[in-house]
Amino acid sequence: MRRRSLLRAPLLAAPLLAAGCGFELKRPPPLRFSRLALAGFAPRSPMAAELRRQLPGTVQVLPDAASAEVVLRAREDVRERSVVASTPAAQVRELQLRVRFSFQADTPGGRELVPPVELLLARDMSYREAAALAKAKEEDELFREMTADIATQVLRRLAAVAL
């Protein structure tokens, strides 16, 4: 019994040590504005949905750009899928998935806050026709992760904006 309690002691001490050193879970960066408008996005854009999801609760997303402090304009929001490798029998063996997002941020008056920026993420994925359904799910998950990564990068750039 004593041996078991000695083995548990380090497990119980680890969270206390982590809390004592200032460790914190990653949070979205603080933004210096409270009203944002998203412009130029497709009606059901996964990127716009992810940006809304990641925005802190202190920022209100407005439908009208005129009443916002910052307007985030999507210039390009594209998901691409291309074949990288195939067999001599023309069966696909590897795909490359890309998410390309370009944007700029300005005030409703037209003052540029973030110049036009293009972000591109790519992931390679193996493919087998025998597992097509599983690979389709994996592809969706990779696109979702890349979209979340790009949204995080956009928010970091918006955090540097000074009005």
Where would I find each of the regions flagged by the language model?
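N-terminal, Lys/Arg- and Ser/Thr-rich interaction peptides
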Residues: 23-32
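N-terminal segment of the mature soluble domain
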Residues: 31-78
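C-terminal motif of bacterial Sec signal peptides marking the signal peptidase cleavage site
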Residues: 19-20
